[in-house]
């Protein structure tokens, strides 16, 4: 199993946070009707990919991408629940549990 170092993990955390911000801003932009929020969303995505590019220098691509995507989805679900009153049905919860289980399996492999 690969030993993780601080800086790649920090960049991965930054990438996840920027992805969450991008998703929230995209929702708030109302389909780019609020152009500045849409532009900020795009800049956040660019920042997230840039941070992910730095993270994969010290973390295997498959692990970094799975963690980035998985944590991003899980946190975006939580943000949608808190900020926009969006709720998952039982199929959504099953999917989220499978996603988290898959992330654990990839990390353990």
From Swiss-Prot:
GO terms for cellular component: plasma membrane. The keyword Cytoplasm does not apply. Its main location: membrane. It is a multi-pass membrane protein. GO terms for molecular function: amino-acid betaine transmembrane transporter activity; antiporter activity; choline transmembrane transporter activity; spermidine transmembrane transporter activity. The keyword S-adenosyl-L-methionine does not apply. It comes from the Bacteria. It is found in: Cell inner membrane. GO terms for biological process: choline transport; glycine betaine transport; spermidine transmembrane transport. Gene3D superfamilies: 1.10.3730.20. The chain crosses the membrane at residues 6-26, 36-56, 64-84, 88-108. Keywords: Cell inner membrane, Cell membrane, Membrane, Transmembrane, Transmembrane helix, Transport. Belongs to the drug/metabolite transporter (DMT) superfamily. Small multidrug resistance (SMR) (TC 2.A.7.1) family. MdtI subfamily. Forms a complex with MdtJ. Catalyzes the excretion of spermidine. This is Spermidine export protein MdtI. The gene is mdtI.
